[in-house]
């Protein structure tokens, strides 16, 4: 997968950073009411179900557990589910200091405090990237990692020099920090989500939820995400990993993936250091494949769980 200009990389980076849905998508059913809600350090945690094995859902940039509501509803009868909200997102207060380092440290505190043994981490986008990070930190404490379109390196960054990545990340953070909440909400609804979600009904449903996140915190998270490159650490991630990768020819072909196989090959190159990783492609879906193809996403998760647990 090649790109001919920085502008294409920037557009691709935005596409990977925020939610997207296909024309026929519909908002997933709501999750059941959580049995408990509590905080562990910087994390807000909602608990569902009482199964023997645990799943921990991590939403993506500027999102909350609402994006996983369909999967939470699907799996809550068989597993104990912990759905976390990262600081600065979905109404949670922002924090100072390093974000990924703080959130992952609090993740391990969650396991300690609730005596959670070998959970499967299921993350979307930035949450999937965090799943890769957790797998490199303490793989023996995890039962597996499922990442929905989250990678060990920000896709746009893979095409750029470190200097350009730094400049782009800093500029992105500063611009988002300059927005008022009203400007952030308007930009999401009118400039970002319409390019990433083809059904206007989905734009209307998701935009006010994304707008609950803090603009400056979203920029800071995005800056850290863009500067990450976990690829050298992947050999440490000796735990089963499933990468669920969406494909939509009408979008991906514009960024060099003219076929679903081309996108799979591109992704495979970015995760090739992981010793126990499998990629599942989901056609006719975009970044938010759990909205586009909910049954296919749930089936991929269920198949992985049947083997990993």
Task: Give, region by region, the residue ranges found by the protein language model.
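Conserved HGGG/HGGXW glycine-rich cap/lid loop of the alpha/beta-hydrolase fold
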Residues: 41-93
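Conserved loop-alpha-helix segment in the C-terminal half of the alpha/beta-hydrolase fold
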Residues: 241-285
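Active-site loop/oxyanion-hole signature of alpha/beta-hydrolase fold enzymes
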Residues: 29, 48, 82-122, 126
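Flexible "cap/lid" loop of the alpha/beta hydrolase fold
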Residues: 145-179
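Conserved hydrolase catalytic core segment
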Residues: 117-159
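Catalytic histidine-centered segment of alpha/beta-hydrolase-like enzymes
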Residues: 282-294
């Amino acid at each position: 997968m090649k790109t001919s200009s920085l502008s294409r990389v920037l557009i691709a980076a935005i596409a990977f950073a925020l939610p997207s849905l296909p024309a026929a998508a519909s908002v997933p059913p709501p999750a059941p009411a959580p049995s408990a809600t509590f905080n562990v350090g910087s994390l807000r945690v909602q608990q569902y179900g009482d199964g023997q094995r645990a799943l921990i859902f991590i939403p993506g940039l500027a999102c909350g557990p609402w994006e996983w509501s369909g999967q939470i509803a699907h799996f809550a009868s068989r597993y104990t589910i912990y759905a976390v909200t990262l600081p600065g997102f979905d109404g949670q207060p922002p924090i100072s200091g390093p974000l990924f380092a703080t959130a992952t440290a609090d993740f391990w505190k969650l396991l300690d405090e609730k005596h959670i043994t070998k959970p499967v981490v299921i993350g979307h986008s930035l949450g999937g990237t965090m799943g890769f990070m957790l797998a490199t930190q303490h793989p023996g404490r995890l039962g597996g990692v499922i990442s929905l379109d989250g990678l060990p390196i920000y896709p746009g960054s893979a095409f750029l020099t470190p200097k350009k990545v730094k400049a782009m990340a800093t500029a992105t953070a500063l611009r988002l920090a300059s927005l008022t909440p009203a400007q952030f909400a308007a930009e999401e609804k009118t400039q970002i989500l319409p390019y990433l979600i083809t059904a206007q009904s989905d734009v209307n449903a998701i935009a006010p939820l994304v707008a609950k996140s803090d603009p400056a915190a979203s920029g800071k998270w995005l800056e850290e995400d863009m500067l990450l490159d976990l690829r050298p650490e992947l050999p440490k991630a000796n735990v089963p990993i499933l990468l669920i990768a969406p494909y939509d020819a009408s979008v991906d072909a514009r960024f060099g993936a003219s076929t679903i196989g081309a996108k799979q090959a591109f992704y495979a190159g970015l995760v090739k250091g992981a010793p126990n990783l499998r990629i599942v492609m989901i056609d006719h879906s975009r970044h938010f494949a759990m909205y586009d193809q909910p049954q296919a996403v749930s089936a991929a998760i269920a198949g992985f769980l049947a083997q990993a647990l």
